[in-house]
Amino acid sequence: MSRVCQVTGKRPAVGNNRSHAKNATKRRFLPNLQTHRFWVESEKRFVKLRLTAKGMRIIDKKGIDVVLSEMRARGENV
């Protein structure tokens, strides 16, 4: 399972660890992914999404129906 948010599309970013001596070693910044079940009243079913904390805030703001319709318009299988 890839580490990609289904709502925002955020994925791991690459950067550097920096020691006190300013040595650089490669590292990955992983998104804050959570698996969450949402009740979709219009479809009378639960939808399980893998999304970031920011994606949950977007659903709180817009509503699950709007977000699902945007995801389906992008071609995401939900």
From Swiss-Prot:
Q: Please list every transmembrane segment annotated in the UniProt record, as residue ranges.
A: none
Its protein name is: Large ribosomal subunit protein bL28
Q: From the UniProt entry, list the residue stretches annotated as the region Disordered.
A: 1-25
Q: Name one GO biological process term.
A: translation
Q: Name one GO molecular function term.
A: structural constituent of ribosome
Name the protein family.
Belongs to the bacterial ribosomal protein bL28 family.
Q: Which GO terms describe its cellular component?
A: cytosolic large ribosomal subunit
Fetch the HAMAP family from UniProt.
Ribosomal_bL28 (MF_00373)
Protein origin, superkingdom = Bacteria
Q: Which InterPro entries match?
A: Ribosomal_bL28 (IPR026569), Ribosomal_bL28/bL31-like_sf (IPR034704), Ribosomal_bL28_bact-type (IPR001383), Ribosomal_bL28_sf (IPR037147)
The scientific name of the source species is Aliivibrio salmonicida (strain LFI1238) (Vibrio salmonicida (strain LFI1238))
Q: Which UniProt keywords apply?
A: Ribonucleoprotein, Ribosomal protein
Q: Where is the signal peptide?
A: none
